[in-house]
Amino acid sequence: MIVIPRYTIIKEKASGRIPEILDNLNLKNPLVITGKNTKKYNKDFDFIYYDEIETSDLENIKNYAKDYDSIIGIGGGRPIDIGKLIAHKSKKPFLSVPTTASNDGIASPIVSLTQPSYMTEAPIAIIADIDIIKKSPKKLLSAGMGDIVSNITAVLDWELGKIEKSEKYSDSSGIFSKTIAIELMDYVLNSNLEEYPKKLVKALIGSGISIAIAHSSRPASGSEHLFSHALDTMKEKYDIDTTSLHGEQCGVGTLAIAQIYLEEGKLEVETFEMLKNSLKAVDAPVTAEQLGFDEEIIIEALSSANTLRKRHTILRNGISKEKAREILEKSEII
């Protein structure tokens, strides 16, 4: 069964409508999962800080919800992911109240606390207060663009899986995911960005819904996400001091993967330029240096990305470091 949000509110002062939405859903006693910086957006409900919750014990995490009829996640990625997980394990409805817009986790059924990610259910309601979101750090909002443009290469990878491995594919989910990305890119390339936070939130929610439709992360996560996960591995392996975000890494990864598709004749030059220029338009990174990684690290990440997850992508069985360097140079990432 496909579960998508019953209520989606994306507007100024939307957080003031949380009690109304709870009432509409006949929910009386929610538990709020939030952070110390976002606690101020919680009104009148019991809460717990996300970093006080032990997430490794998946079976007992449901006990946090035993005295409540619903879970609300207020904040960025981690409070919302933990809220989704508790709601899933306790079989209680989940409401997502994002305070920034850096990835599609605000609406998707995916929990990314571990690798591989964990499938739950999409939120029953999403309440996105634009007054709050537009005040979040610009770096987070530009990271959201990186997460959205990655839909283009993710869907190409999914289509490749269908062709080369007879993988199940959803036309409606794939088309929806690509259209969301194209519309946001078109907006940032042809406007003054005044409405960017609202447009971004709408796109991220749409991306999350495309995942719910497919019941898979495929429409929004492909080889560019494997590249991002590889960079995370490099950070730990070499103790790299960088503040690069998931969405930023996915954006750069999208350019690298798009270059491969370009060389195979499966992506137009105009599309590649649109991807790159839309990232630049919101000041998202497009080079290794802007991400905070040395050339050799980026090369190692791209050449090893295929090993991070058993998922068929354009990387197939992997590429050599020499080929990775060539791709990264041609796409001007290094």
Swiss-Prot record:
Its cofactor is Zn(2+). The keyword tRNA processing does not apply. NAD(+) binds at residues 77-81, 99-102, 108. It comes from the Archaea. Substrate binds at residues 104, 147, 229. Pathway: Membrane lipid metabolism; glycerophospholipid metabolism. Keywords: Cytoplasm, Lipid biosynthesis, Lipid metabolism, Metal-binding, NAD, NADP, Oxidoreductase, Phospholipid biosynthesis, Phospholipid metabolism, Zinc. Its EC number is 1.1.1.261. Zn(2+) binds at residues 147, 225, 246. One of its GO terms (biological process) is glycerophospholipid metabolic process. The keyword Nuclease does not apply. Belongs to the glycerol-1-phosphate dehydrogenase family. This is Glycerol-1-phosphate dehydrogenase [NAD(P)+].
